[in-house]
Amino acid sequence: MIRKHILSLLILLIYVNFSSISQTVINTESNLNKIDSTFHLFIDGMGDYKKGNLDFFMIKSNLTVGSRVKGKNLLRLTFSNNYQKFNGNAFKNNISGQLRYNYFYNVEKHHSIFSFIQIGKSMRSFIDRRFLVGGGIRKRTTPSKNAGYFDVALGAFYENESYPTYKFQEVEFSPKTYNNLRLTLNIFTRLKFNTHWNLVTVMYSQWKSSRLKNYRIFFDTTLNYIISKRATIFLKFNARVQSEPYIPFISNETDTLIGF
């Protein structure tokens, strides 16, 4: 019986280390180039169910709806969820949704002004609710379409976060809500090495305006090998770093994923 529980725990720990990162940052970059003047819908999902020596259930999905209007207006609606349960106990329940608008004041150079509104929650990060609204300016520094692009975005957003009651070192902490104004510096790159290999990288950095030592960095990079129009092998890595987490036992998170 003890060996059974140890084996179950090891499987859970391995899965957590390689499962998707628990965060309420939404990466809207992956399908950006595929959205033209027509209506586009992108859906992907996965699920897993095991029963026996251990009970495990997981469902994960991502949905993006987007369209360009008159060439200069880009509208995207993104939704994602990740729910996981082990032996009857949920240990991950993340939901995020975002509406983002870009106005391209220079279509040829891909310079745009953007605004967004987002809401989400993260069980693993102890966030009951995270609400964001903000905007900024995004500029492309590389003109080549064939080799890829390197974009830089500057902006700001209002952040409202709610945390539940929790206990730490035998001390019980009451629910708390934080309201911040954060400054952002974001980097978006897509490098095309040849007809088969490309690298897509996104880096979001978020700095509390009244205390720059309080920052969050989200890094996501994917190396793709394109076999055909319908088949791609990828290696994905992402990380989330918080300099001053509001929950003291919340650590930085990383995720590595290989897929087809």
Where are these regions (language model features)?
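Cleavable N-terminal export/targeting peptides
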Residues: 1-36
